[in-house]
Amino acid sequence: MTSDRDLIIERLADVAAALDSRDWAGLGELFTESATGYGATGREAIVERVREHLGGCGPSQHLLGNHRVQLALHGDEDRARSLTYARVLHLGAGDRSDLSYECFGEYSDLWTRTPDGWRIDSRRFHISFDRGDFRTLQPG
């Protein structure tokens, strides 16, 4: 049987893959209906906010590591917290194909176990270092 920690780490990889493949429907499925993240509230608003930044940018790669997972948050077996390092590279597209933007940071996620498995209920990303041109990120 797969541990809850491993299931959460697998979901984190699913989020990164959805971001990089621009799988908007798949990304939405990884959040609860009322989730907060990326400065938005609600699953649909979160996906729309991400689309505003990644929809028109070229290839991206979200590399994740140094996972720290705290299960049974506040004694609740259906709540968890994860802290995950990320190194993210974005390349430009179209008339911005010569641009790039890279950042290092840490995701802080709160998780809820649902009938469909673990889902993100809250997501924050703290950027500790960045370089390049943020204009690389643009709507599609």
Predicted segments — roles?
Residues 1-33:
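Short, low-complexity N-terminal intrinsically disordered segments enriched in polar/charged residues
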Residues 19, 31, 86-88, 124-127:
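Short beta-strand segments enriched in hydrophobic/aromatic residues
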Residues 62-65, 103-107:
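Short beta-strand or tight-loop elements
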Residues 74-78, 94-98, 115-119:
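Short, solvent-exposed loop/turn segments that connect beta-strands within catalytic domains
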Residues 81, 104-135:
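Short beta-strand edge/turn micro-motifs at domain boundaries
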Residues 89-100, 130-131:
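Short, cysteine-centered beta-strand-loop-beta hairpins and adjacent loop/turn segments enriched
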Residues 138-140:
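Flexible, surface-exposed loop regions and adjacent strand-edge segments
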